[in-house]
């Protein structure tokens, strides 16, 4: 504010503060008006600094004047303020704003006359304002001055903020003052993203251009020399004219103002767009009943600006419609002001009118004039009742005891007795806030199971007993309730009709009220006065004793109170006589809320016809279920339906009801499966006493969510449609509905929780309705606990039938047979069949799988092969010889029953694995030899090319996972593989697999590696450069090799692929070489297969290669990038490419060019992604005009630890971009932030830490990075913050160079994006994933992932592994900035790494080393030595 106050100084400020805002008004100008004016100018993209001089004020006035006619009130106020300020600067004496405007008008008229005079004298020396696009140079020639970015930015901002509201038109008019058609088109292009609006504008311009051409026909004949041609419509729109022509027309004699004409056309188009975006007519703008007048005026003028009418019409609208459409409150006031009132007077008069506050004031005024009017809120019960306030203390009316001025009366104000106060009075009253219970004489009754299960799961309702006038209070308090009581549900208020004194009345059954209170009714007999306390205070009543009342055909006699009660109440004094009880039947389990999937409705599927016997069976079943409250009848108002049918139970004449809930299941929300698998007996601890229970009708014991029940509706049809079908819906969890298992499990867990907490010594395994209960208690104690558990379940409505209560072993549980000290699967009988169908085989495989968990050695691979492919279930499948053999072996294994033992937590687990051949493995898990806890098999082949070691590692992982699930720990393994073999393979593949502790066991057949690849080239052996190529269209290919000794060979192949030809070339080299050979390939595919050392494969060609490899003594295989200019590789490339390869990379050129136009990828990325020769890729980059700005990056010594990021703010287009760089990889995260504050930086750091492992950040000393918010964020996320040191090369080098790089990429893609924030994210994507180079030839995105993954692996696996030579280290010496390497990694510590470079062992600080996996690029030549961090 201080800055703006300096616009005026000293005496001028005093003059400013004497000027009045309005003639005769009280308010005067203040400093705040200057501050406001400068902010408004800033908003309209005008320089606020112009306010400091008279000349500047004049320039502002010239700019604002054209917008006054159509502008907002703010523009007019701004114009008035600047006009007044101009007068103060010029020392022109004025008293108020009006005088200032008159003076300005006078000056402008004088200037106009002078200008006209000067024009006639041809002495026009006046300076044109710099804001106009056409200015005169020193020679007096008109020159175009392009629109400033500030003006364009202001225009874009207007459209972004206002969309196409009416304000846009005056803003456009002001910003485009004097512009040429080219400038106007520039303005339209900046908002080209609004395509619909631009299309409408284009149509209007085309129409106007056509109209111009019609009215101004072109003159016949050529244009005379020196004469300017006449503009056509398309010339005015700037499409067929150039800038010089436009300037010529605008400054010619006579001038043709093409800019103004085009501007007029655009404004016509903008008017149409505004009408579309603001479709409300001025006639529809009416003030709401509670809408403040100010808001109504805002809406009115906004709509008025959008109206396409002349200013006179708009003035008429303001005068008439504004008052006419106001609400009645405001209209009254506005009419009173008269017709000549200004808008300001109207707004002042209507301030505060029309809102709730105004209504309250009017009401208060009205209320103050009404004396003693009672407003009663209740029904008609209080018709003649006038409540007079009376003091308890002095007895006078008009005040209450709390406000009484008389001396305090002794004793109780209610009963008059001394010794207590009224609040402690024990005199009888209807005490709504009582603490005594309803039935003190007996405890809450417990239900018998039968009764519990007979009631509806939803009802929580009072029941009135017929018969005895008093409740039974037998010794056990167990009395059975007959089912013919009236039931009153509590979904609505329990209102009943009662007969009292020969009259019928409606009354509320209130178990919370002590007394029965009725409203005015005439009763015979004597009464005595009484006062009772209620919710609304104290009321006076008449007490009648021994009054007979009849409710629901039952009679009771008791005390009744008559008085002004809001509702008739039957209290407990009557209810207890009637034998009314509150019942809580079935399980009081909370229902789990369930919904349909969003946007879906319930099922509406018609019932299909059923046979007579099925209809009878279903009718009977549903009648029983209805009686038990499990289903309820519903009417035709429920539109949903699910089909129902019936099937006969196994080995029984009884029927089972089945509802086809498939459609409802599709529409029901998804549930999280509470239990992810079934418990396994091998995980059970050995227990002294065991019981197995089963919950009867498990699902039917749990209520279904009330609002969901309607969707379970079904219909029992009648025979021959004799009558409408009977409609039901479920009240409990239905069988076959997808939510039932999860909700049941969840409810059961909640119910068992208190029992488990009370009895920690008891183990309960719960799976659906099967319960295994084990303990180390004596059998009698154990059985007492079981009884307690069953009672606990019964209390919640879960019935455990005796029929399924297993007390003695063997226990049948979950398909297992449990004995006290061992377990097995329930007996398995394999069928004997002549013909096997697909379905039979599926069942057989299922049984064998089930048996394999305890019977070792079971195989099913050959049986599974029989049912591969799409076959019908009933198709007959002939058994192959192998399958018959496998089945016979399995039958033999199953002849002898095998048992498993139980788990002893004190002993360790051991897992032993055997290889069965044909990719099948078997294993046993035990704690004592020959006493298996469980067994299993493994027969998966996860990849096409594999070897036994790889498969063994997969077996071990499967067992480890299984053990963690069952026992919560991993076993110690005994594996049939020698330590040396394992170590050899593990050295190469330790990254891919984790193996727990293990030992060698000599169980043939042993696992071994059949051949081994060398790590270094074999000295003296011939080197074969191999390559293959294939044409995609003709499928013709070539494979061949060239050796370092000059040998070469090429063969032609048909019906092949690139990958096959590469493998074929390796096979040729192996065939034609000696017992030792070096092979160099450019195929990552071939390298990947062979480096994994497979000993079997689904590919015949790979099997042939394996056979050749086994014959060799030594083989070295290496990879080089394709077409790298490496001698032999380039030769063989030419050899196999003749007539083949040409096609391959040519079809990549177009795609690469297309990608480069989008992402400006560097040549390495294109060569790699599109298989292009470097020459072609470099040519694409060279021909791109945006990629020729590259400079060299400077390199200091930077900390390259994996967790270090550098942060910095950079500026572009007047906006702030916060950039974070991962130092080790060059990966970037960047974002446009609203302001350079600590809050924004802290939020960015937290977001960064949420996505990547950030250990330390390095920033400059800017106030945003040194702020408390950033420190707090770093403290919370455990990030170390370091600050840059000025003049230190290690300071902020990486992020500074990345800022430059990012800005360069933004420049390349800027025109593809409308907003800077979009361009920034596009540039980040391009830098991270579309630019390759530097270490490993990766992109920054690939490099960061590799570095982080490598860091994790080296940290975690170092504990178990010592041979980590497979990683390569690139490092820098203290003085030399060039990266050296690759060196071997010997050890990785916290602060340093030990490496071996050639024969020298060095210790390098961790921050000066980068560790990455070696992918066999040792022979790639100089090109593979790590370059700089960015691209070459």
UniProtKB/Swiss-Prot annotation:
Segments for region (Interaction with membrane phosphatidylinositol 4,5-bisphosphate): 73-77
Single Gene Ontology BP annotation: symbiont-mediated activation of host apoptosis
Chain positions covered by the region annotation Dimerization/Multimerization of capsid protein p24: 277-363
Site (Cis/trans isomerization of proline peptide bond): 221-222
Positions of the UniProt region annotated as Interaction with Gp41: 7-31
Zinc finger (Integrase-type): 1147-1188
Presence of the UniProt keyword Zinc-finger in the record: yes
Xref: SUPFAM superfamilies: Acid proteases, DNA-binding domain of retroviral integrase, DNA/RNA polymerases, N-terminal Zn binding domain of HIV integrase, Retroviral matrix proteins, Retrovirus capsid dimerization domain-like, Retrovirus capsid protein, N-terminal core domain, Retrovirus zinc finger-like domains
Annotated RNase H type-1 domain residues: 1018-1141
Entry note: cofactor: Binds 2 magnesium ions for reverse transcriptase polymerase activity.
Region described as Interaction with human PPIA/CYPA and NUP153: spans on this chain: 189-227
GO molecular function, one term: lipid binding
Record protein name field: Gag-Pol polyprotein
